[in-house]
């Protein structure tokens, strides 16, 4: 019985099923309308600059949707088909999502940025290494490393002398033969300067720019490994001193006498903590950003090292010193 009217059993069963179905239908319709307006789909031909709508312009609702959203049929919706005045004329531009701002320490005025820039520039498209830019990168690397601790000062003191020696060749009377790593190797080989000491009377690789660069090349590898491990070391893992010590054992210790190795290991004990190194590398930023910046810088050093390693190996000069 419905509202005092007796219904047949079949009609009663129909009402019992129809009412829940009608409620479910209305609920689904409500959800679909909400979903339609909350999650707009890409419509390339109707892009606008309304960032609040994710840069997309929605079509005007149909009469049915308009009635459900208090838009009577025939009345303009709140999303007109015509573009807004601010969206027309010469000022109209496609929506561009700004990229994350570069970290200051990687910029032209940051220590890492000043170091990375010449090292990137030294790698020519032809596969060579420009010596003037390579040495400029080394100058900035020395300036960056020296304040980081005793261990870096220990390593950079010798590197400074080698950079100065090569710069004298780049700007000296034979400067035309020292424009790049390839031109230097070619000329010094022709001049008989690439014989290992003791292999041929009257000739010594000790006076060659190629030998000096090889020593810098090994030091660059140690710097790159140390900075990379400081940047990527896990929390609770080995401290920065341990990781830089391992880098020294890999890159430089095999080429140093016993006394130098012991002095280097003592210097590593004074290495600042990882957090302090990150602050010095990228001041004014959080640890996560500093790690990213230092890892990028170490990646550039690795690219330069790999390029130089390939050229030296190709000419059989890795054992020159």
Curated annotation (Swiss-Prot):
Q: Which Gene3D superfamilies does this UniProt record tie to the protein? A: Glycolipid transfer protein (1.10.3520.10)
Q: Which InterPro entries match?
A: GLTP_sf, Glycolipid_transfer_prot_dom
Concerning Pfam families, the annotation shows: GLTP
Q: Which residues form a coiled coil?
A: none
Signal sequence, start to end = none
Q: Name one GO molecular function term.
A: lipid transfer activity
Q: Which GO terms describe its cellular component?
A: cytoplasm
How is this protein named in the record?
Answer: Glycolipid transfer protein domain-containing protein 2
Q: Which organism is it from?
A: Mus musculus (Mouse)
Lineage of the organism: Eukaryota, Metazoa, Chordata, Craniata, Vertebrata
